[in-house]
């Protein structure tokens, strides 16, 4: 850009000098020599500027980089068994599931969300028979039947389970909290039998289908430990429903 400016400026001077009668025009050779010198000076200037930029970049690249401040280790969701504190119990609200209960006494009723299921109560007291019967009478319409028969109950002695990673973990049966320890209970639902009728599930066309009742599982949060080291809330599998599994009979369309 600067070279073009010099050429235009010199051309302007030549025009002015050509129109002036009082001044002598510069010789052609001297004018060309002046233009060449100006162009060379501009090229040299650009070359020096580029070299200075390269030197500056090389110098900055040799400087030691400022070390980033060390990150604080993220707070682990798991605690050592010996250091298990009340914080884990306070996390129950965040991780709570209606099928998991922490209590200092055995629950006598199903969770509110599962009042309509076939609940099998504890046979400790005889006066609870009517209560168990009331929970079991959930069929409100005559003539309606389930394809599979299921039963639900509180599991009070669960000691191990499979977590979401496929690892076997230990389920904490008792958690010490001050004066009164609490226990962990699981409300599970499973099939009463694989074949409620002779040929499998109830109401299935056995001419075209093979059927069988199977217990299905899902994940809930529970207090567990792995290798008796770290305690925390993990996703584990428990029995939660009974479903009918179908497969088409070979040769049937």
UniProtKB/Swiss-Prot annotation:
Location in or out of the cell: Secreted
Name assigned to this protein: Neurotrophin-3
UniProt xrefs under PANTHER family: NERVE GROWTH FACTOR NGF -RELATED, NEUROTROPHIN-3
General function of this protein: Seems to promote the survival of visceral and proprioceptive sensory neurons.
Glycan-bearing residues: 127
A molecular function (GO) term: nerve growth factor receptor binding
Subcellular location, principal: secreted
Organism name: Bos taurus (Bovine)
Region (Disordered) residue spans: 62-89
Keywords carried by this UniProt record: Cleavage on pair of basic residues, Disulfide bond, Glycoprotein, Growth factor, Secreted, Signal
Propeptide section residues: 19-134
């Amino acid at each position: 850009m600067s070279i073009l400016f010099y050429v235009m400026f010199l051309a302007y001077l030549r025009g002015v000098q050509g129109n002036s009668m009082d001044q002598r025009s510069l010789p052609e050779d001297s004018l060309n020599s002046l233009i060449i010198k100006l162009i060379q000076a501009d090229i040299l200037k650009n070359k020096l500027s580029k070299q200075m930029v390269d030197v500056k970049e090389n110098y900055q690249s040799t400087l030691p980089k400022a070390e980033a401040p060390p990150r604080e280790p993220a707070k682990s969701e798991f605690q050592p068994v010996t250091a298990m504190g009340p914080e884990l119990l306070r996390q129950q609200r965040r991780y709570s599931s209606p099928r998991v209960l922490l209590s200092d006494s055995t629950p006598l009723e199903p969770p509110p969300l599962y009042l309509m299921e076939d609940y099998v109560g504890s046979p400790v007291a005889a006066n609870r028979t009517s209560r168990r019967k009331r929970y079991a009478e959930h069929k409100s319409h005559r003539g309606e039947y389930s394809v599979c028969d299921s039963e639900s109950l509180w599991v009070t002695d669960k000691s191990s389970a499979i977590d979401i990673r496929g690892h076997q973990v230990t389920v904490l049966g008792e958690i010490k909290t001050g004066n009164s320890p609490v226990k962990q209970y699981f409300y599970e639902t499973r099939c009463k039998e694989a074949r409620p009728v002779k040929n499998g599930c109830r109401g299935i066309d056995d001419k075209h289908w093979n059927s069988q009742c199977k217990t299905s599982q899902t994940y809930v949060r529970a207090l567990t430990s792995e290798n008796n080291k770290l305690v925390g809330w993990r996703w584990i599998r428990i029995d939660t429903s009974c479903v009918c599994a179908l497969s088409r009979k070979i040769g049937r369309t």
